[in-house]
Amino acid sequence: MITIDIVIGNICSLLAMITDSISSSQKTTKGVLLVQSISQFIYGFGTLLLKGYSGAVQNAVSILRNFVAIKQIESKVLEWALVLMGVVLGVYFNNLGLIGYLPVVANFQYTLAIFKFKDNERAVKISFAICIGLFTVFNVAILNFVGACSNFVVTVATVIMLIKKK
């Protein structure tokens, strides 16, 4: 049965997608991160409505990570603290069993890839495809159809690009 929370959660995903597209038109990294933070807030709100708490926690940690980047705070300790926070809070607030771990694993592996392979575009893109693929499954499970469709399209596009650029 479609409830008001499902409708509003999906509308939030649509608004967040629009905000994500606006972020790409920003002229500065600070502008991109600020608009992406707004997007993460909207995604997080929608994910909360859809009762995907471990995913909402990942959105909140992403906002904190962007804030640290906007303030240009360079600290490996802080970066790893944010990774640890995402894992611990994601596990703690997981209410969906194995499915609830998908956003935690997705963000964890993607963050590690960025730390370890930041100069290897292909490795980061492979990790991104895995991340978005995991979020596709999670979004289906929480009935976030808008998010699942957009994640699926991005995953397929990324995989096709990776295959073509072998």
Residue ranges of predicted features:
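Alpha-helical membrane-protein topology signature
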Residues: 1-166
